[in-house]
């Protein structure tokens, strides 16, 4: 997995391209390049093309996203209902991790 970050605070394997893609698609259908731009804008992470399309294939196979009809030679994707549920659950878990981490950091 190749992800380039604009920050020296690189979490490496703690960063999940699937979560970034699902979060990007939460604002509506997008094609690959639009997702790369959106993800870079909202979190400063640049997904490499190979990483993006590998993750898209896995997400589609899991039924979390679906491909739409081509638009000007570009294939947009959108979240499925299952994908929305998965994203909500993952974000709730992340919120709990953030809350716990912040509480624990406050004690040191």
Where on the chain are the PLM-derived regions?
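Histidine kinase transmitter module recognition
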Residues: 24-27, 68, 86, 90-93
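Basic amphipathic alpha-helical segments that dock to polyanions
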Residues: 52-54, 58-59
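Basic, amphipathic "hinge/linker" alpha-helix immediately C-terminal to the N-terminal HTH DNA-binding motif
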Residues: 72-91
